[in-house]
Amino acid sequence: MSIVTTGPDTGYYVDVFRSRKERGGDKMHDYFYHNLGQSMTLTAADGTDLNLQPTEELAFAGAHLYAYSYLYDKKMVATNKDVKATFTIDMKDKGGDDIYMNLWMKGEPEREVFTALAPMTEGLSRTPGMPYNIKEQPTLTFVARQHGEAWNRPFVSVYEPSTKKEPSAIESVSYFDVEETALNDFAGICVKSKNGRI
């Protein structure tokens, strides 16, 4: 994880997560992220609907991983599109300045993306001054699954927190590859700010 500062009050995080089995034979690799909030959206990066559908994946029923059996209200789509997730903390009872976490992720062939709900975040439920009753709210969850290896097709993400009063400074996130085949582990990211800075 890297922090990129673009101004006195603006910046974002970059995460490039690679995963593979040392001896090959990779079935799949998962990228798991959850965030506070009462609502979450997951769309293509251009804002179009991904048409997520209910799924039984991410559970013991899928014979993949016991730890995912606590997830519920799971939805999934197979897509190679770049995606954007937005987690929202509704602050209507605290002055109306909603808080967002914006996540952009590069698409890849043989990838699936999921939304799900997880049990509430116990540790934070005891923190005073939280903007909503965390004990009554499940934890919003995003999962990306890469079939095969995820070393040359890593999970490439950009995260930016924002609020209603201090909106996102990012206009778009795009990705590029290099033509040099020896650099097959290269991850190129182009973040365009609303002020024109790239």
Where are these regions (language model features)?
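CBM-like, beta-strand-rich accessory domains located in the C-terminal region of large
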Residues: 1-198
